[in-house]
Amino acid sequence: MKKLLLAAAATLLVASCSHADAQNAPPKRELRGVWISTHLSLDWPNRTQTPEQQRAALGAILDHNKATGMNAAFLQVRSQADAMYASDLEPWSYYLTNQQGSAPAPAWDPLRFAIDETRRRGMEFHAWINPYRAVANTASESNPALYASKHVSRTHPEWLLTVGTVKILNPGLPEVRDHVANVIMDIVNRYDVDGIHFDDYFYPSGAINDDAAYNADPRGFPATAAGRADWRRDNINLLISRVNDSIRQAKPWVKFGVSPSGIYRSSTDPAIGSPTSAGASQHYSSMFADTRKWIQQGWVDYLAPQVYWYIGQAGSDYQLLVPWWNDNAYERHMYIGLADYKMNTAGWTSPNQIADQIGMNRAHANISGQIHFRHAFLQGNALNYRTKLQQETYARPALPPVMPWKGTRAPGAPTQLAASLGQDHAVQLAWAAPVDSADEMEKTRRFAIYRSDQREMDLDAPGNLLAATDLATPAFADTTAEPGRYYYYTVTALNRLSLESARANTVSNDFEPPSVRTRDAQLTLADGAASITAADVDGGTGDNWGVESLSVSRSSFSCADIGANRVELSALDKGGNMASAAATVQVLGTMPQPVVGVAPANAVVLGYGPQTLTLTAGDKAGAQAQYQWNPANGLAAEGAVATFAPTAAGSFSFTVQAASAQGCFAQATVTVPVIDARCGQGKVALCHKTGSSTNPSNQICIAPNAVEAHLRKGATLGACEG
């Protein structure tokens, strides 16, 4: 026991240090449910109201739940073998029409209405079922208004088991299991519910006389006290496993869970039970509900134990029970039922009690949320505890946690997200919904809206989740956007299991483009190139939210750009808006214009006249150019001057490249013909045109001093061609 107390103290210390922080950082995914009780009209409906008034009242309840920060409603639709919906199996509820079995007039279906209205507010709808209770109080059983002729207590009294002042459907009868399963599947098949939810009404506490049922179907359980207890637990097991199998086969996305009382078993051995008082009510033995087996076997998607004790309560301490349930989740969801109804009673006088319990839930990895009992007490707001939930604990919305064992396929992503400014500074978002899959599990049911002041927003950060829309409407109005403050938005699609798609594009509520101001820039080329940055031409660009980046239409310049150049400066602001303006960039430098002069002649005649030519490069642009000749073979070049002394006939082309001081290059080419007129013995070869068709030309060799006279007569230097 000493070790147990030390462990409890350690748990308290860890919890006290951690759950406050956890509370300040609410998770992105967390079930936040509210039980809405219809039995005795505890929360709804008022049986004397008109259908229109009842609808308005239910709408107000759902509005209140949504405003509190909830994401799931658990509406009691069958409290004592009756129906808050149109059923061929059980009569209309007394608490709806003031007469059991009488349909509402004018006709309406409260369950269908509740589903639609809950979904319209972006919440899940769970149909809350009392599986076995048939007559809540035998003192009123004879009242025909409460129990109509078609009620099971009238049609099949042999199915009932009386325990104290309560009558239940006998769990040991196969026909009872058939009936309850049929009722549940009637709801599942005809209504688009998100979940089926059982509460803790199994075998009630008290003397149970079920000998006849046991004797008729003992199924091998021995006729001992322990055997009878195991038989009763097996009766419940048979229904739980059957309902689970039936739901999975019909609509595998529908969630099935049970909310038992808060203590499974009491034991100092955690493998058996929780460290709670041996005298506390333990549903394993008092209600014959083996809930741990159900979750171990995967027969339920979640348990929601009603841990209706305050932190530090002797014998049934909240801070000792929650860790035990956390350790027994078996890879299913574990929610905690919270006792809102006890606020401002003995032990519950702290306005932070419920908020602290939620903080403790969040500090345990396998606790996936909580359900509040019940709506009227949230509405009553004792000690302003609901105000604290609304303003702090549930200030940011949360998505329901995913159930990977039910499915892992997410819907397609939304596209074409756009933002516009609505009335009163509201930000209107609209997008294109993804094309729905033929697979019901992948169809889009809702959208999650995210908002952040960071463009690269973290979708897993709970503070960035703004809302979950109703149904699959591809639009949303952010009425919480503060005037003068700017945000980024994106959207994801959610399927029935709240599995999330990839994100859409990101938009913002900044619709004002940047104010781009420019200045002119002047650049001097170096090595034939120069460059600028956006800052060189930015003359003080500004934006209402902030400039994210500046860019220029071109940043590099060459010798071809010498002179004035138009450049666009573009500014992208944080909201994704872009604007641009022109600037002039003056590029300084000189482009050479080389020319080549040849002297003393334009050609070389080997054997006659000058045998060496001088090629001289110059620049018409007046640049102080540097020159390079190509090809250099056969030239004696030094800077701008090159000497050409050929030794053979031919046509010789030479290129000179001029480079300015700024690294700009240009070329000029000259071609020098070389004629071979050498005849030997110092004579020069000439070709005379004879005019004869048989002998059109005649080659002669003459002395150099006679060449000019022959040239004047039409002779040409060199040998005759052909």
Specify the residue positions occupied by each region the protein language model found.
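Aromatic- and acidic-residue-enriched segments that line the glycan-binding/catalytic groove
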Residues: 83-98, 133-163, 200-223, 269-279
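Substrate-binding cleft of secreted/luminal carbohydrate-active enzymes
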Residues: 288-292, 296-314, 330-406
